[in-house]
């Protein structure tokens, strides 16, 4: 039992070495900025199919880096995303992740209107001008609502939308139709995704800035 790797940094290093080895020629599909994100998603899920499913549209990484470096609010459609993000790194850039799905007022309004809390939460978050990034890992209705608000010019164009809701009802469809918005967008095509995937995508961007700034 003494031969296994014990140090967390060594475990992570070896994990990424394995990912690089097993990706093989697929590495060439991605840019220098995209590849760390792809690897981090695979590291989180242990699923190499994500290398075929992930899609980057409208230069999302550069757009995200600009607003993250200057500080912004990040709306998340689940508490799991908020809790999973690195608060230490976000704090260095004055970035604040938050969600409204558990807000009492949002819950009350959603019940009265007969819609999901994700819809109401997105309506409120979209009107906050400091919110530049949207991470959607659970609710297709949140992604549909965000698309609707963008197309009606009810909100400013986001700097980044990570649209990776998971599931069987509306997940694939919402991700597909959101591409029409021409907003900086990272998505996982098909049914796969989830809150942990949303977290890994933003971390893949954040760590690039973190290293660049020499922290």
Describe the residue ranges of each PLM region:
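N-terminal glycine-rich anion-binding loops that anchor highly charged ligand groups
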Residues: 28-43
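Charged, compositionally biased N-terminal leader segments and the immediate start
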Residues: 1-32
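Short, basic, glycine/proline-bearing loop/turn elements
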Residues: 44-52, 107-108
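Alpha-helical scaffold segments in soluble metabolic enzymes
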Residues: 14-22, 40, 63-67, 84, ...
């Amino acid at each position: 039992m003494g031969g296994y790797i014990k140090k967390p940094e060594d475990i992570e290093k070896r994990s990424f070495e394995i990912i690089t080895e097993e990706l093989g020629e697929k590495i060439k599909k991605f840019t220098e900025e995209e590849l760390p994100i792809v690897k981090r998603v695979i590291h989180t899920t242990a699923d190499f199919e994500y290398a075929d499913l992930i899609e980057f549209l409208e230069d999302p990484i550069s757009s995200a880096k600009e607003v993250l470096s200057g500080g912004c609010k990040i709306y998340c459609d689940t508490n799991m995303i908020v809790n999973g993000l690195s608060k230490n790194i976000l704090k260095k850039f004055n970035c604040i992740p938050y969600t409204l799905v558990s807000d009492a007022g949002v819950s009350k309004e959603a019940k009265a209107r007969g819609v999901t809390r994700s819809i109401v939460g997105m309506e409120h978050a979209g009107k906050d001008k400091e919110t530049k990034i949207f991470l959607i890992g659970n609710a297709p209705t949140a992604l549909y609502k965000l698309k609707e608000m963008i197309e009606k010019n009810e909100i400013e164009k986001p700097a980044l939308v990570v649209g990776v809701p998971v599931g069987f009802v509306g997940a694939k469809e919402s991700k597909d139709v959101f591409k029409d918005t021409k907003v900086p967008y990272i998505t996982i095509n098909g049914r796969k995704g989830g809150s942990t995937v949303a977290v890994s995508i933003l971390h893949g961007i954040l760590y690039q800035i973190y290293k660049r700034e020499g922290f």
